[in-house]
């Protein structure tokens, strides 16, 4: 994403269709250029939204002055990875830093791409990621911003989803399931596994789900090409 550059809209949000609901700004953690800020403002004026998006296995990923070295992150955010309470407090600080960035640049929220384990997404300390998400939700509610989670498709990835509490699942605006190459039967099996993971909130989770697809790479793409030929 480069923003508006002359007459070209190739790398601009405003080059997207007017019907676009929202866009996740992959690997954007602030420091927007003048061109990006102008593009974002015009994009939002059309009724569309844009949210920050990155992977964060560890507390402080991408927002820690000095880089992503473990020792640097632990020192800056003030936590011991073996001490649960210090991790919870640091996760809340990290969430507030994301909120501050969204407010500074008038970004519409945060899309948490959940694909990595670490000091933030920790299966042995589920209170940490859930405190992080709860803080984001509470702060975003004050300004009408969005909270989204990306989770890879495939039953083997659902351990990330299972770490999220039912309260966290219900608090999300959207869940984007990255099911790029699954065919019809694979999707059926996957969402049956989703149901088993959090049966009490399955209906609500499905109501806020975005299911990704790459038809060109899907295992059953031949069904579509055969229909086109007939």
PLM region spans:
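Secreted glycan hydrolases and related glycan-binding modules that recognize and/or cleave
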Residues: 1-230
